[in-house]
């Protein structure tokens, strides 16, 4: 199997939904199904923070979400945990700068999707040189979902990466809503990653569908 083509990766990033059980008010499996019905293009399992599942419960929950993704042919990515990604035969993994080194991750994951969070041009170049398939850039806007975020980059921060020749697929992260999603694409991102704007929406289906419309218009 060869690594994913750039054009295909770019398409998958369009509406990238990230969720764990503690990101929902409603049943997470219901939220997930609604989001898939609404047209999300990629999913990341991120079971972290207060109230998150651990141990075997976490693994079983991941398997349930993965089964839904397979049903809809939406790739299933695991946040940070390479061992879990391998155990589940996930489609890929997303790592931050504080996680296991990108070189080691690429070696372990083979040709599967590897995404890396980058906050500087140097981090971006290092990730690309060591096998990243896409970069997560952000936070673009202020966010309350993640407690350990870096300084807000803004749309100008996103543009800066493109101006400096970073040409692999990029997904914007942080504080992205239906109202500002199109501006993230215009600033140079291939897609938007979303947690609460879908997971906490009164209708995850309607929200996901609206994001698809904003990103693809």
Curated annotation (Swiss-Prot):
Which residues does Mg(2+) bind? 80, 99
Gene behind this protein:
thiE
The UniProt GO MF terms for this protein read: magnesium ion binding; thiamine-phosphate diphosphorylase activity
- Pfam entry (one): TMP-TENI
> What are the EC numbers?
2.5.1.3
Q: Which organism is it from?
A: Bacillus cytotoxicus (strain DSM 22905 / CIP 110041 / 391-98 / NVH 391-98)
Is DNA repair among this UniProt entry's keywords? no
| Cofactor binding mode and count | Binds 1 Mg(2+) ion per subunit.
Question: This protein is called what?
Answer: Thiamine-phosphate synthase
Q: Which residues bind 4-amino-2-methyl-5-(diphosphooxymethyl)pyrimidine?
A: 44-48, 79, 117, 146
Instruction: Cite a GO CC annotation.
Output: cytoplasm
